[in-house]
Amino acid sequence: MPRRREVPKREILPDPKFGSVDLSKFMNVIMESGKKAVAERIIYGALEQVEKKAGKDPMEIFLTALNNVKPMVEVKSRRVGGANYQVPVEVRPIRRMALAMRWLKESARKRSEKSMAQRLANELMEACEGRGGAMKKRDEVHRMAEANKAFSHFRF
């Protein structure tokens, strides 16, 4: 982290098909080894499948799934007097979005369907309904924060 000046945020261009910056960011999260075309094919394929299965606007389902998975609080380790405490802190909006995208990707990868597009489509559908691996991860993080509420006075 530089001390001299604030590092400017990179401008991320919206994706060509839906015109969404969030979808573009998600594409960058899915992308491996700079293969953006592959990530694009996976995401657009998944959204196509979501549209077929749900019969609703795929972007609406994608955004609902993201909002459902976003964590509100998380725990951070804080050392006080020789002991480490898990202190619950509120998650900043940018990190909130990044964590949600990362968790969606990870839980889609762990699924057993054949193609990544199928896995992602099913994970998005489940997250939209409030279940699935990503939702489980979010609930786990919230549970940890709730369990350590007593240490919230050690805030940073």
UniProtKB/Swiss-Prot annotation:
Superkingdom to which the source organism belongs: Bacteria
UniProt cross-references to Gene3D superfamilies, sorted A to Z: Ribosomal protein S7 domain
GO CC, alphabetical: small ribosomal subunit
Gene Ontology terms describing biological process: translation
A Pfam family matched in the record: Ribosomal_S7
Family (UniProt): Belongs to the universal ribosomal protein uS7 family.
PANTHER family: RIBOSOMAL PROTEIN S7 (PTHR11205)
NCBIfam families xrefs: rpsG_bact
UniProt name for this protein: Small ribosomal subunit protein uS7
Organism, scientific name: Leptothrix cholodnii (strain ATCC 51168 / LMG 8142 / SP-6)
Encoding gene, per UniProt annotation: rpsG
